[in-house]
């Protein structure tokens, strides 16, 4: 996937060294945008193996409104484990496994009094607006609540996404991400929001269009530089295709979106180079 290689090279060629909250240090740059035409293939990195099932299960967990890392782990995904132990959650008076008002809560109960589900269901509102007012320029979901940003160990990195319905039939999505771990996080983020666009298009009976990816601070952790160079030495492979398995067209509207499971998505023809392991900066 050339766009991903371009992103990494942009940091290496133009970035500067920065200190960061983890103490690891980064090579960081600010401001990047790229575009993926979802009709030409599903954007997933091919120069290392990306566990697509983890991408999908995490997204379904977000959409459900759940914030329990224990429940995500039950789906076979442990990528939030570093922020879910008692050492991290006790700082906020929460038990181990309770991540607090992270993505799922903010998407489904924005402005609420955590853990009460008394906020705005942005996903429900989004689907309603796509159906009733597709020309709206307000098809927006935000994950950044200043009241809650200090109430979690890891406030949202991917902070706002907007949809546009073109000509009444094609759905585009743009994501703004305030902070992007280029080696570990970005491959997940690209595929997650591409999948979200496919799902939203399917349940609203639209076609997929473009996914536009806009970054604020995008960075390579210093202990990932060897892995980045290894990845860049590899040649990108052709992109796979994504199909939604819904032959009876049962997945419609909010209920359909929330009923979607990994078994409903089929990534066809994903070929990749081997896995490249790297430590998570906590």
Range-by-range predicted roles:
Residues 1-282:
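Terminal, non-catalytic protein-protein interaction segments that mediate quaternary/complex assembly
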């Amino acid at each position: 996937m050339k766009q991903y290689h371009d992103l990494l090279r942009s940091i290496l060629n133009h970035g500067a060294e920065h200190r960061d909250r983890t103490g690891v240090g980064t090579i960081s740059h600010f401001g990047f945008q790229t575009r993926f035409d979802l009709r030409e293939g599903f954007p997933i990195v091919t120069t290392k193996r990306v566990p697509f099932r983890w991408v999908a299960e995490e997204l379904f967990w977000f959409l459900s409104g759940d914030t329990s890392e224990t429940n995500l782990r039950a789906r076979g995904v442990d990528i939030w484990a570093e922020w879910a132990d008692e050492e991290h959650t006790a700082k906020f008076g929460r038990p181990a496994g309770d991540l607090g008002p992270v993505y799922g809560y903010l998407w489904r109960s924005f402005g609420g009094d955590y853990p009460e589900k008394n906020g705005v269901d942005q996903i429900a509102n989004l689907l309603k607006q796509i159906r009733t007012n597709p020309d709206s320029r307000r098809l927006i979901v935000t994950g950044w609540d200043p009241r809650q940003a200090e109430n979690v160990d890891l406030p949202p990195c991917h902070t706002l996404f907007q949809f546009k319905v073109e000509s009444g039939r094609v759905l585009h999505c743009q994501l703004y991400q305030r902070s992007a771990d280029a080696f570990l996080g970005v491959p997940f983020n690209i595929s997650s929001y591409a999948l979200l666009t496919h799902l939203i298009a399917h349940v609203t009976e639209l076609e997929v269009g473009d996914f536009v990816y806009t970054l604020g601070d995008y960075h390579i952790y210093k202990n990932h530089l060897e892995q980045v160079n290894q990845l860049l030495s590899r040649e990108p492979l052709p992109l796979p295709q994504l199909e939604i398995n819904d032959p009876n067209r049962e997945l419609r509207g909010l209920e359909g979106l929330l009923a979607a499971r990994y078994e409903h998505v089929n990534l066809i023809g994903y070929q990749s180079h081997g896995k490249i392991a790297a430590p998570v900066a906590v």
